[in-house]
UniProtKB/Swiss-Prot annotation:
Protein purpose: Binds to F-actin and may modulate the chemotactic response during early development and contribute to the maintenance of the strength of the actin cytoskeleton.
GO molecular function, one term: actin filament binding
Protein name per its UniProtKB record: LIM domain-containing protein C
Pfam families: LIM (PF00412)
InterPro entries with a match to the protein in the record: Znf_LIM
Alphabetized CDD domains for the sequence: LIM_TLP_like
Main location (coarse class): other
Protein's UniProt keywords contain Metal-binding: yes
Deleted gene: phenotype: Cells exhibit normal growth, but display altered morphology and F-actin distribution. They show changes in chemotactic motility associated with increased pseudopod formation, are significantly impaired in growth under stress conditions and highly sensitive to osmotic shock.
Keywords assigned: Actin-binding, Cell projection, Chemotaxis, Cytoplasm, Cytoskeleton, LIM domain, Metal-binding, Repeat, Zinc
Length: 182
């Protein structure tokens, strides 16, 4: 018996099914509920019946006090890897039915994480499996445009080397790499 994929609302047959959050998905439809990154079995966490990647789960649901070294009760724990061994059903012959409703499915979301608008191919920069506008791919702190390989990420936000070092690096560090003592 096939079920309906919650992402694309099409039938899921045993040969193409993965089970997550008590639901049957197509392998490519098991995606983070927030950023739509494709997830692997055991590499996601569940919240309110929806799968999330580690980055989004931590950013959206971790409790205050995380940076202070306190214990976080609501932290990311990968969901257990579940393999299903349901018998393979023969694929039914194709039928040609008239759809009763129009279903719009966006399999490859291209919304920029910074501005939320659609990023088209000619203005696109891909970083961490997300599509950014080239103009939006800038330091979160000083808004300086970033060059490939010359940036750092912290909690899903991108920074130029100088801002990252000043915010998250050890105190007393200078751009020369030497510790200044007076």
């Amino acid at each position: 018996m096939s079920s309906i994929c919650p992402t694309c609302t099409k039938r899921v047959y045993a040969a193409e099914a993965v089970k997550a959050c008590e639901k049957q998905y197509h392998k490519l439809c098991l995606q983070c509920f927030h950023c739509h990154k494709i997830l692997q079995l055991g590499q996601y966490s569940e919240r309110d019946g929806q799968p999330y990647c580690k980055t989004d789960y931590d950013r959206l649901f971790r409790q205050a006090g995380y940076r202070g070294g306190g214990v976080v009760a609501d932290s990311f724990e990968p969901a257990p890897k579940v393999e299903t061994t349901t018998p393979v059903e023969p694929t039914p012959p194709p039928t040609f039915l008239t759809p009763t409703e129009e279903v719009k499915v966006q399999l490859f979301p291209t919304n920029c994480p910074k501005c939320g608008k659609k990023a088209y191919f000619n203005e696109l920069k891909v970083y961490n499996s997300r599509d950014w506008h080239k103009t939006c791919f800038a330091c979160f702190s000083c808004n300086k445009n970033l060059v490939s390989g010359q940036y750092s990420e912290k909690e899903g936000l991108i920074y130029c080397p100088r801002c990252y070092q000043s915010k998250f690096g050890p105190s007393g560090y200078t751009n020369t790499g030497a510790l200044v003592l007076h």
